[in-house]
Amino acid sequence: MTIDLHCDLLGCVEQEPKLHFEHPDTNCSIPQLLQGGVRLQTLAVAAITCPGSTGVTQRQVALYQKLLKEYPSVAPYSAYHPTSEKLHCIFAIENASGLLEEGEPFEEALKRFEAYQAVEKILYVSLTWNQENRFGGGNASAVGLKRDGELFLEYLEGKGVAIDLSHTSDALAHDILNYIDKKGLHLIPIASHSNFRSIKDIPRNLPNTLAQEIIKRGGMIGINFVRRFVGEGPQDFLDHIHHGLALGGEDALCLGSDFYGGIDIPFSLLPERSLPVFQEDYSNASCYPRFLELLRSVFPERVVQKISYENAYKHITANISL
């Protein structure tokens, strides 16, 4: 059994007319997820910061409702049970610009958040994507936390929704942690789809200080399968996991594949050297049995099971009520 913290199936289908929920070019199609043994998949509702971002989110939420209606093999998180053979899904908001455009009153974000929570549980929210927005700085910037970001963190207090640091600048991530402490907020930081900067030095990966803060605060770190974030071969996956364990992350490491395919964003923003996006043997969601065998060749079964599903399951069930 596998639990995955991040894929872009909804964004693939929303942005590319030729794709659908069973299309293999998504790299996270329903058949691929089921073949990979995924029993709980976090579906990112993702938007870039631009005019119309809230409409993108609205369309992706509608696609999720269509998915549940048309595919009997897929069920909502509210129906999740570890013994079920169905694929269960939960939401995440990747970039709060999908809840609020740059010129709108702040209160509109809260209305939209509550409306989407009524459709499906939201596991986590990222304030930003790559760029700066009204909430703070994304991973391609050096901007920290802004006032609207502070207000949104306060709003999330006690709602059982994690705050995702995978697409923050380092400054924003540190500001978020400091603001949580300053206000005494019950808000758990995670990195849903990031690896370790000590192994692969790119901004989307975690520096040791942030990784250790996430671990210390009971959060999750989802291992990302994008080649540019991992490295060129299987050994690079193992190196990231070894590093995470050395930082004390045995109970924090999870899977956060970031599988997607065939869409203009983020492909159009990637440098040419980023292609192919994934390693050949680990290029779509059906690869999980093979990936877990790779882990078993090095790590004890206890660690493999924690990474595969136990850590994510414990976090989700402890922080989100059915």
Where are these regions (language model features)?
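An N-terminally biased module of ancient metal coordination in phosphate/nucleic-acid-related enzymes
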Residues: 1-43, 273
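Conserved, mostly hydrophobic/aromatic
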Residues: 6, 33, 121, 163, ...
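Active-site beta-loop-alpha junctions enriched in small/polar residues
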Residues: 6-10, 46-48, 92-96, 128-132, ...
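A metal-dependent hydrolase metal-coordination microenvironment
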Residues: 26-27, 32-108, 130-149, 154, ...
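Glycine-rich tight-turn/loop motif centered on a GG-T
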Residues: 54-57, 106, 137-151, 159-162, ...
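Histidine/acidic residue-rich metal-binding segments in metalloenzymes
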Residues: 107-119, 123, 139-162, 168-190, ...
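Short acidic/histidine-rich active-site segments
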Residues: 225, 248-270
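Mid-to-C-terminal alpha-helical segments outside catalytic/metal-binding sites
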Residues: 279-322
